[in-house]
Amino acid sequence: MSWDQVWIDINIATMSPNISEPYGAITDAALAVQDGKIAWVGKRSDLPEFDVFATPIYKGKGGWITPGLIDAHTHLVFAGNRANEFELRLNGASYEEIARSGGGIISTVNACREADEAELFELGRQRLNALAKEGVTTVEIKSGYGLDIETELKILRVARELGKHHHVDVKTTFLGAHAIPPEYKDSPGSTERSDAYVDLVINEMLPKVIAENLADAVDVFCENIAFNLEQTERVLSAAKDAGLDIKLHAEQLSNMGGSAMAARLGAKSVDHIEYLDEDGVKALSESGTCATILPGAFYFLRETQHPPIDLLRKYKVPMVVASDYNPGSSPLCSSLLMLNMACTLLRLTPEEALAGMTRNAAKALGIEDQVGVIEVGMTADFCMWNISTPAELAYTYGVASCVDVVKNGHLVHQ
């Protein structure tokens, strides 16, 4: 017998719920890869005999293998930056005040409308490289910085191209309903103009996105500075009817009931959720919808309202941890930093945080049958870390500990 690869002198955090040990751990382990899949995993003492002359053997020097990390919420393709708004916030301006004065998302929209695809691709490639160096093997990229047909399609095309030219898998999300463009700004007491923009998203943008196969999912920002509950449901329902997965930015600044509505529609995830209440948590539990925690935005905006972690535990809602990398509220292109922040700021355990970037993140993207755990038959996406315990991934930051990355059975970083 021979395999494409065999890994020995390792410990494995499989993250499998089928193994009762913390992290689904197998110590003194071995792992075999064949045809891009995990062909065998278990104790090294149980490893079947194989042709050592025909099989490449990799020695982990006692380190740990984990599933490849999955960043399930990013806005990675954009132009420009918002360093000036950073200074405004430090001088007392709120996120909402900046947004209402024409800053925030709209300032990035203007930069993206001016940028061409080549510029956006190069910027996205650099950011994707940064995540890949930290063991990320799958990433979600949203649009939402165009807010017109041409630019929304441009951003999604760039995201698709990044996936074709990089070893990191890219899942794309259409977020045309990210903010209300200035040209559709409502008069006081009216939603006529923003309703017209929602019509544009549903009737013109979405069909073009589908025609070019540019999105795996559709997202909406449901908040008092963006889209109301009725508008949000219209967009999500249209996406669901078109056969796309749905997800939602919800309960970041207030409790509008978006999470419960999205759960009723079968959303894969609701994200941010600082103001999520117990009824909303129950709705997520009943629908199997994931709750995505975004500690980078919580930190950068200096928020004080914590996501309801204890309630999510109580009702066994899968918790996802993601970077929310974007120029305004989380300009932090580091998944490992998010693991640390999830623990130190939001009180997740290191095991919960790692599950949030592996097993649960895969569920949020609808790819839990392919990646996120190390089990026989799963895609061979995994990382080799120079650590003594998986908790180190959340405990320390700034020390390069990712030694190797295997993607689809191929060693891509060594």
Swiss-Prot record:
Enzyme Commission (EC) number: 3.5.2.7
Annotated 4-imidazolone-5-propanoate binding sites: 82, 145, 178, 252, 329
Principal place of residence: cytoplasm
Binding positions for Fe(3+) per the UniProt entry: 73, 75, 249, 324
Cofactor info, note text: Binds 1 zinc or iron ion per subunit.
Reported cofactor(s): Zn(2+); Fe(3+)
Keyword rRNA-binding tagged: no
Family that this chain belongs to: Belongs to the metallo-dependent hydrolases superfamily. HutI family.
Name the UniProt record assigns to this protein: Imidazolonepropionase
Origin species: Shewanella pealeana (strain ATCC 700345 / ANG-SQ1)
Designated gene of the protein: hutI
